[in-house]
């Protein structure tokens, strides 16, 4: 009897938590990655959901399109070596698209501000 009562209580507790979590996520249009008004996903890669101004997403797309023209495959880092005047963007771990140092600084600031540009449910 005690085991049955404990199992019933546990199932109620578990069911309560299960019901509360999806309700919170469902209230956000894009789940936990929903951006505040005026912001969009940067999409430096398909999984990059840092919320930025639309102009920054446009710049990231342009950087991706020009990526091959900014590398020196014979450099110290092989196919990931940037030509002079460019550095890795580092929008996310493994992002080796070459950009200007100023642009990398902007991307780092965007990453640091990620919680402020996202709707917190």
Residue ranges and their predicted role:
Residues 1-8:
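Bacterial N-terminal signal peptides that target proteins for export
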Residues 26-121:
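Post-signal/leader-peptide non-cytosolic segments of secretory proteins
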Residues 14-23:
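C-terminal segment of classical bacterial N-terminal signal peptides
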């Amino acid at each position: 009897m005690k085991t049955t009562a404990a199992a019933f209580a546990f199932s109620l507790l578990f069911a309560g938590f299960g019901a509360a979590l999806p309700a919170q996520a469902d209230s956000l249009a894009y789940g936990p990655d929903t951006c505040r008004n005026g912001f969009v996903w940067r999409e430096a890669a398909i999984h990059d959901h840092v919320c930025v101004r639309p102009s920054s997403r446009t710049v990231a797309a342009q950087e991706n399109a020009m990526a091959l023209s900014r590398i020196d495959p014979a450099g110290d880092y092989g196919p990931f070596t940037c030509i002079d005047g460019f550095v890795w963007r580092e929008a996310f771990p493994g992002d080796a698209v070459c950009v200007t140092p100023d642009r990398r600084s902007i991307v780092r600031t965007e990453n640091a501000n990620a919680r402020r540009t996202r709707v917190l449910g």
